[in-house]
C-alpha cells in the first residue's frame, strides 16, 4: 500500500491528490493520510492554519488511510514517527525506510513503490500531466450558496469568455512574513510581471488582464491600465472561487504559488499560454533546461524578466 500525506494549502492538496490519482490509475493500492490537519502541534507551527479543502470540490473522491493501515506501512517507525533516530535513518538509508520524503523537483522512483509513506508537495506537472484531462473532470467547483457572490462570479466568467482573457496572480500575504520571506520573495518581481504581460500583449493586443491577489490595495496601486480588472470579492472559504475564475481565463500568469498553478492547469482552453516563474523558492537551483523538460507546455520567466525559450 502507498500512503500519501495530505498537507499544506489547497494547491498543495490538489497536487497530492493528483499523484494519488496517477498512482491509482497504475493499479496501485493508494490511500490519503489526512491526519495532518487534525494535528494541533503541526498547525501551531504554521503562519496560517490550514484546513482540508479537497472536499470543497464536488467530483473528488479518495480513500483515507486508517491508523492501522498507516501502522502497517510504517512498522516500528510508527512508534518513533518524528524522533531524531527515525529522521536520521531516513536520510542515511532512504531505500530501507518506509518513508519517502520529496527532496527534488521530480522523483521518477515513486512510480515503482509498493509499500511507502510519501511526504511531499509533488508540484512538478510531469507526475500527472497525462491525466490532467481526467482531473479537470473531477475538480468541479460547486455553486456558491451566496446568491450575490454566485452572480458576481458568473458575470466575471462571462467577461472572461468574451475576451482574450488573462489571469494574473500576485501573492504577497504570508510570503512577506517570517521565514517565508527568505524562501519566496523577489521571485515574482515587477520585472517578472512586466515581462509576462508584455509577452502576452505582443501576441494578443486585445488581451484583458484579470488580477487576483491577497493584497488588492497593493495591486491597485502598482498596476493601472484600462485593460486591467481586479477580482476582489472572493474571501475566506470562498477564496477557492478565485481558482475557478483563473481557470476560465484563456491564458494564465502565475505567481510562485501552487494555487495559481492549478488555476492554469484547470484551464481547458486550447491553445493557451501558461506562464510561471523560473523557480519556486530561493533555495531551489534553477537549471533552465531541466525546468523546461519538467514543465513542458509552460513559458518560464526569470525574476529579472527574461523569457526562457
Regions found by a protein language model. Name each.
Residues 1-44:
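N-terminal pre-catalytic "stem/leader" segment of glycosyltransferase-like enzymes
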Residues 45-199, 203-204, 302-304, 309:
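Secretory-pathway luminal glycosyltransferase catalytic domains
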Residues 5-13, 185-189, 238, 256:
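Aromatic-acidic/polar surface patches that form glycan- and anion
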Residues 10, 194, 198-285, 290:
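Donor-binding and catalytic core of enzymes assembling or modifying cell-surface/extracellular glycoconjugates
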Amino acid at each position: 500500500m502507498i500512503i500519501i500525506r495530505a498537507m499544506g494549502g489547497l494547491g498543495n492538496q490538489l497536487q497530492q491528490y493528483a499523484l494519488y490519482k496517477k498512482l491509482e490509475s497504475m493499479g496501485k493500492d493508494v490511500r490519503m493520510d489526512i491526519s495532518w490537519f487534525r494535528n494541533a502541534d503541526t498547525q501551531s507551527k504554521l503562519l496560517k492554519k490550514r484546513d482540508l479543502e479537497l472536499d470543497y470540490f464536488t467530483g473528488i473522491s479518495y480513500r483515507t488511510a486508517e491508523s492501522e493501515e498507516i501502522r502497517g506501512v510504517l512498522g516500528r517507525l510508527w512508534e518513533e514517527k518524528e524522533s531524531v533516530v527515525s529522521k536520521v535513518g531516513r536520510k542515511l538509508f532512504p531505500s530501507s525506510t518506509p518513508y519517502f520524503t520529496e527532496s527534488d523537483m521530480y522523483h521518477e522512483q515513486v512510480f515503482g513503490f509498493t509499500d511507502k509513506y510519501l511526504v511531499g508537495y509533488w508540484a512538478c506537472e510531469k507526475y500527472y500531466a497525462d491525466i490532467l484531462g481526467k482531473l479537470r473532470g473531477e475538480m468541479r467547483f460547486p455553486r456558491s450558496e451566496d446568491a450575490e457572490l454566485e452572480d458576481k462570479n458568473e458575470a466575471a466568467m462571462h467577461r472572461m469568455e468574451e475576451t482574450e482573457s488573462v489571469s494574473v496572480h500576485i501573492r504577497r500575504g504570508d510570503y512577506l512574513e517570517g521565514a517565508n520571506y527568505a524562501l519566496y520573495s523577489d521571485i515574482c518581481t515587477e520585472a517578472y510581471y512586466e515581462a509576462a504581460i508584455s509577452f502576452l500583449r505582443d501576441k494578443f493586443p486585445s488581451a484583458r488582464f484579470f488580477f487576483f491577489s491577497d493584497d488588492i490595495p497593493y495591486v491597485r496601486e502598482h498596476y493601472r491600465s484600462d485593460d486591467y480588472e481586479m477580482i476582489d470579492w472572493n474571501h475566506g472559504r470562498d477564496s477557492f472561487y478565485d481558482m475557478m475564475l483563473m481557470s476560465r481565463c484563456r491564458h494564465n500568469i502565475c505567481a510562485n504559488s501552487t494555487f495559481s498553478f492549478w488555476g492554469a492547469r484547470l484551464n481547458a482552453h486550447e491553445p493557451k499560454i501558461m506562464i510561471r516563474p523560473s523557480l519556486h523558492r530561493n533555495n531551489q537551483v534553477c537549471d533552465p533546461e531541466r525546468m523546461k523538460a519538467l514543465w513542458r507546455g509552460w513559458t518560464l520567466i526569470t525574476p529579472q524578466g527574461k523569457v526562457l525559450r
